[in-house]
Amino acid sequence: MKLKSLIPLFLFILLRHCIGADYYVDSLNGSDKNDGLTIRTPWKSHLKAESVSLAPGDVVHFKKGSAFSGSIWISESGTAAKPIRLTSYGKGELPKFTNPTTSDASGNAIILGGDYLIVENLHFHDTPGEHVSGMIIMTRLAALRIEHGSDHCIVRNNEFIKTGQGIMSAGEHTLITQNYLDGPSYALWRTSKSSWGPMGIHLNIGNQEVSYNTIKNFGTKDSPWGSDGGAIEIDCGKYHKKNIYIHHNYSEGNAGFIESSWDYDWPRYRQEIYNWRVSFNVCYDGQSWLFMLAPCTGIYFDNNTIARYNGFGRSQNACARIDVRGGKPVGKPSGAHFRNNLFIYSSSPYTGNRSSDALKTANWYSKYKSPNTKYMGDSNQAGSGDPALVDLEKQDYNLKADSPLRGKAINLSELYKLDFYGRPLPKTGNWDIGAIQYNTTKPTKALQPKR
């Protein structure tokens, strides 16, 4: 009889090991006295997801319409074939996560401390920043934080609203894709002489990919720098910055799109960067589109559409600011290279101590409301003047049929397959300048999320 009674338990454990378990959390109608194993018996607290021993293939489902406050830390690991997944279920608004105080896990709502973890279809909001003091904590602030050593994680299809930092990742082989981030205007910390943040996505290490995200309104207007923050920042000099791929993102209203620091990190490490691809992004931001301080080796900016004519209340207004400190000169083949980009600018396409020597190939330059202004660069450029876009003032960056951008870009099909809208790029022949290739058919659905 005892042997027979153990058989169902053995089968349950075997089945769980093979296919993984499903757990359910409902903050409105659940109870922590339940087993959490069915939709009818959900837990109430999201802390149960931390206390249970998750195994490869397990899925934690959070009920739509639920709201959770405070931090949870997922320390277990999945596998490549059986990742552990945090997701939503039911109908209504995405389940909401916040952490209003830095005294609890530095203000993180969810911390990933294992490998092969997926976070999807969740909503993060109102994590702290404005009243934070001290520089050490800034290396940990974020609504969703991936710890160093937590590799092969995926963050997809989530919302981050008014989070001082949306996503901070110190894990390698991370994919951050198709998230919607709409930021605050307050700094993560502030003194009389300095401030820092806010940022949408903060990468602490290399071997990461950021793609198909919408990132909006991360930046201050009143910091000692004039403004600070931005869509994506790559720093924390403790770890290498090799192999980063940032592509097919839409950014708007941020204090810049990308910043890579040098000697500003805490602690003050100096970290050179290697093998980046920043391609097919559409960026309508204030401040500088690119603020590059770190020395570059094999860094490529390809087929981006950069509209830098609205300051969004911020004073700095160059497209690419290259103030590299130390390391190899940018203008060497081992440095930074701009190819096939559309620069729409109000002051200058490039600025900084190394900008004149940066490698530039087949870019188009258009000074806002001054279509006759000619770019006084070298003959390797595609040209300058009115790009003939469908409606620049309404942020419609599609090319008109008579656009001079058509057929002026070099073919990079050995590196890229799809334009900003996911349409196939020609395998042979010249491409069009910018992130959006000319097409008579409008895409049925944007790949970058809207809200």
Positions of the model-derived regions?
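Predominantly extracellular beta-rich ligand-binding scaffolds that present long acidic/polar faces
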Residues: G70, S75, A105, H248-S251, ...
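Right-handed parallel beta-helix/beta-spiral solenoid domain characteristic of secreted/periplasmic
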Residues: H61-K63, S77-I137, G383-P387
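C-terminal accessory segments
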Residues: S379-T440
